Amino acid sequence: MEWRAVSRDKALDMLSTALNCRFDDEGLRISAVSECLRSVLYQYSISETEEARQTVTSLRLTSAVRRKLVPLWPDIADIDNAIHPGIMSILNSLAELGDMIKLEGGNWLTAPPHAVRIDNKMAVFFGGEPSCTFSTGVVAKSAGRVRLVEEKVCTGSVEIWDANEWIGAPAEGNEEWSSRLLSGTISGFIDAPSNMSETTAYVRGKWLHLSELSFNKKQIYLCRMSVDNHFSYYLGEIEAGRLCRMNSLESSDDVRRLRFFLDTKDNCPLKIRIKISNGLARLRLTRRLPRRETKVLLLGWRESGFENEHSGITHHVFPEEILPIVRSAFEGLGIIWINEFTRRNEI
């Protein structure tokens, strides 16, 4: 065998071809780290003496991936932030997606193979073995943390989930879930203490001080007040600018989900503009999603925002093929999806 040196750019091209990955820069790096983690976990979990798969520690996984990829990304051990996640962050996100199983004590196992249906043709493949071990005829495309395959190769061989089933949002829908939360919380109302003058109420997507409310009659609002640099959330009955009765909402995740319902109810839903170009979809998110829906953001990756932009605003990139799953999560919350690529072609 003849060995020859190649440039870093050439090596990245070869890696992109091997992974069947059409992205460069951060898309390629995350694809490479993800597939390398799958490969190392598969390799290290096989025992020569036992039939069952063995657990592998986080340290062993991340160290092996770092050694393999440091020639291409010399600073890979030092990278770890929201825009450029490190090896351990990517490993944890694979567990959130269901691609691997995280056990107590920092141990890992391969997840049973399963797929999530995108449309009538493609699916996202989770769990199982690395792509290099797939049988002949199964073509996997690396797309960031995930792999895309034709749905027909999964039929009859692995369990196929619908997008909403995988997302795991309340099956009854956000309207019914929120209505039940509201009625249950209101039934536990108690008289409000006198020291709640800093309460703000959520009205049509904005937090308003009680003195700014235009209605004097009794009305129920989602409320919050800052306590020790954190917000405390509650439902409040307000009359003539005064909080009369209230009941706490303990889960901030419930509050996020409820806000989307209230926006839809008040006819001011959050609108997301999707810009599609060269097979990539970009969006700007101005609010945090509930925990279950948040995992769809891991189907893509982050981009830097603009200078002096609010820290709560995030920018996301997705392979265009994955958009139906992302859209399903957003529309389940009542978010209005505006496809700017489609709009331009309709003009």
From Swiss-Prot:
Keyword Cytoplasm: yes
Designated name of the protein: Druantia protein DruD
Function: Component of antiviral defense system Druantia type I, composed of DruA, DruB, DruC, DruD and DruE. Expression of Druantia in E.coli (strain MG1655) confers resistance to phage lambda, SECphi18, SECphi27 and T4.
The species this protein was found in: Escherichia coli (strain UMEA 4076-1)
Disruption phenotype: When this gene is missing the Druantia system does not confer resistance to SECphi27 in E.coli.
Main localization of the protein described in the UniProt heading: cytoplasm
Keyword Cytoplasm carried by entry: yes
Residue stretches in coiled coil: none
Location relative to the cell: Cytoplasm
Superkingdom of origin: Bacteria
Gene giving rise to this polypeptide: druD
Example of a GO cellular component annotation carried by this entry: cytoplasm
